[in-house]
């Protein structure tokens, strides 16, 4: 039975996160995928590259599943399957690409890096844009950029994870992080080998606090070094997007 790798996009504002929720009344990305796939006869397990939190979007989440219904590896047959899946997942989830991969492929454990973009609006967005950007004003832009660069490299991010979330190893490596502007928005791009729960929201929030003189650079460094927690507020997830997962 062939294994499929799919790159998907979804609107996180309508979901309570990627993972299945204990409260069955809450809508999850994975639950919606399972329902949509079942409607075309696919009842395989679906494995994701990561679990995005409530309100976090994705333009490049990676999942894998198996299906015996479409054994033909020809491009036309795979595109037909993608079309069928998108018809069932519309309007909040889209399968952007679909390929047959080796049966040993695992979207989470085989991933070398993941990247996120955070869209920040310095002005209050309209009700139509509000679910897709975070309303945050940068103080001093130079200070903000300096704070972001302090995260680059390998650190113990024990104080950059959501309270109550357990992780055995909090060591993570940030390969790249930068700030730029596009069409009136401040955008933070970050790429790392993995992220703790709410880590990106806490990182950007701490950098914003430093740019506004609400947090000293010494305190920021103490927190990055895993010595002491000073900043504790994860900013709104509205503008956060999982944009790519990298493999060999």
Curated annotation (Swiss-Prot):
Keywords on record: Isomerase, tRNA processing
Query: Reaction catalysed?
Result: uridine(38/39/40) in tRNA = pseudouridine(38/39/40) in tRNA
Species of origin reads Helicobacter hepaticus (strain ATCC 51449 / 3B1)
**Which HAMAP family does the UniProt entry name for this protein?**
TruA (MF_00171)
Its Enzyme Commission number(s) read 5.4.99.12
Assembly and oligomerization? Homodimer.
Q: What class of enzyme is it?
A: isomerase
Function recorded in the entry: Formation of pseudouridine at positions 38, 39 and 40 in the anticodon stem and loop of transfer RNAs.
Describe the family membership recorded for this protein in Swiss-Prot or TrEMBL.
Answer: Belongs to the tRNA pseudouridine synthase TruA family.
Give me the residues that bind substrate, please: 116
Q: What is this protein called?
A: tRNA pseudouridine synthase A
A GO BP entry = tRNA pseudouridine synthesis
Provide any one GO MF term from the record: RNA binding
Q: Which residues form the active site?
A: 53 (nucleophile)
Q: Which domain of life is it from?
A: Bacteria
Q: Which InterPro entries match?
A: PsdUridine_synth_cat_dom_sf, PsdUridine_synth_TruA, PsdUridine_synth_TruA_a/b_dom, PsdUridine_synth_TruA_C, TruA/RsuA/RluB/E/F_N
């Amino acid at each position: 039975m062939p294994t499929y790798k799919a790159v998907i996009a979804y609107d996180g504002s309508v979901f309570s996160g990627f993972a299945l929720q204990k409260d069955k009344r809450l809508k999850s990305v994975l639950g919606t995928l399972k329902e949509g796939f079942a409607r075309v006869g696919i009842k395989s397990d679906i494995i994701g590259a990561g679990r995005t939190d409530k309100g976090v979007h994705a333009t490049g989440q990676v999942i894998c599943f198996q299906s015996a219904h479409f054994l033909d590896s020809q491009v036309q047959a795979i595109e037909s399957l993608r079309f069928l899946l998108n018809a069932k997942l519309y309007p909040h989830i889209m399968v952007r690409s679909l390929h047959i991969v080796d049966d040993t492929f695992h979207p989470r454990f085989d991933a070398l890096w993941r990247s996120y973009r955070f869209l920040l609006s310095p002005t209050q967005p309209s009700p139509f844009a509000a679910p897709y950007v975070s309303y945050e004003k940068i103080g001093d832009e130079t200070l903000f950029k300096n704070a972001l660069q302090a995260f680059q490299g390998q650190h113990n991010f024990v104080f950059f994870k959501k309270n109550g979330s357990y992780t055995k190893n909090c060591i993570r490596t940030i390969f790249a992080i930068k700030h730029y502007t596009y069409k009136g928005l401040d955008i933070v791009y970050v790429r790392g080998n993995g992220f703790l729960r709410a880590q990106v929201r806490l990182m950007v929030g701490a950098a914003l606090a430093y740019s506004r003189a609400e947090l000293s650079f010494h305190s920021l460094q103490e927190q990055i070094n895993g010595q002491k927690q000073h900043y504790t507020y994860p900013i709104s997830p509205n503008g956060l997007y999982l944009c790519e997962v990298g493999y060999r």
